[in-house]
Every structure is written in C-alpha cells, then in structure tokens.
C-alpha cells in the first residue's frame, strides 16, 4: 500500500496537481498539506516511507474530522483494508462528497484473506492489537468466503450509489497492474 500511495503522489505532482498526505491509526499521526511543487514530492515520499502501517484504527471518526478540516475541494484517496464499521466508513466518505470532494477508495486485500486458502489450522495474529486466534480453515472456509464477498460487495454498491470510486487492490499484483485498475 505504501508503494501505491507513493506512486499516486508522484503522478499527481508530475501533473502539477497538489498532493498532501495524512496518516492515522486511532488518531491522526501526520498531516502534510497539499502543494504542487516538485520539491514537495521528496517530503511526501519520505513521510510515506517512514509511516507505520498497523495498529488499531478508527477510520470513521477520523474521516469526519478530516472532512471538516479540508476546506479546498479536491480529490481524497483512502488506501485501507476497510476493517472497521462499514456503515460508519461510508458515512465518513459521504461527508467528503457532501463537502464537494471527489473520493477514491483503494481497498487493499490479500488473496488469502479473500479466499481463506489454507489447508490446516491457522494461527491468526491481529496486526492492530496482536490478539491471536487459531482455527481450522476447512471448517469455516465456505461461510468465510461468502461473508468476505458480502463485505466487499457492500463497499462496491455503497460507493457506486454515493459516486465514490472503489478499486480493490490485490497485494500480490504489481504496482502497474494496481494502478491500471483505476487509471
């Protein structure tokens, strides 16, 4: 996901569009206001490189806060696994739309997360809080895959209804394939 964000920042600044960056978990960790100068590119890329992924998040609350703090209309891009309350995330994204922003979601999905393609017991470790859970994937695979498809379809449908672009990104795809899905 960091490479995707870096590529998007690069493309925006090379087109002389302003690009900024906000990283967050339970709170906003970093905000760099948008600028279109080429010199701004290094600052954004360094900040993206140094940002930490993981930790618990409260996406929906932070989306509302950000929507209120960004006064100039523009393009808002959310790169996330979207593992939070789906309805609250959509409400937060609609807040941006209400303020006149265009919104794109890049939903980051690992193929094994999508298919639960494991043969035996799996020990899951939550990257946000290190909780552990061991399960036999064969016992839950069918129900899990159905639930995951419903989860993704919820976002696709709600985004379509609210004029929000939704792009599912496979973590095993190369950067050019990921970008071509949207561009």
Identify the meaning behind each predicted range.
Residues 2-183:
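Exposed, interaction-prone extracellular/peripheral surfaces
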């Amino acid at each position: 996901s960091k490479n995707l964000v870096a590529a998007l920042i690069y493309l925006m600044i090379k087109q002389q569009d302003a690009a900024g960056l906000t990283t967050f978990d339970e709170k906003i960790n970093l905000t760099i206001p948008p600028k279109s100068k080429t010199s701004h590119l290094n600052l954004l890329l360094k900040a993206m490189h140094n940002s930490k992924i993981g930790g618990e998040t409260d996406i929906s609350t932070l989306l509302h806060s950000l929507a209120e703090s960004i006064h100039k209309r523009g393009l808002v891009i959310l790169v996330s696994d979207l593992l939070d309350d789906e309805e609250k995330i959509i409400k937060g994204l609609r807040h941006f739309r209400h303020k006149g922003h265009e919104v794109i979601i890049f939903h980051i999905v690992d193929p094994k997360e999508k298919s639960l393609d494991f043969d035996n017991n799996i020990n899951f470790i939550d990257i946000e809080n290190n909780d552990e859970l061991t399960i036999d994937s064969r016992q839950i695979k069918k129900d899990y895959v159905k639930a995951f498809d419903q989860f993704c379809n919820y976002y696709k449908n709600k985004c379509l209804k609210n004029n929000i672009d939704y792009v599912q990104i496979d973590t095993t795809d190369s950067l050019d394939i990921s970008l071509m899905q949207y561009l």
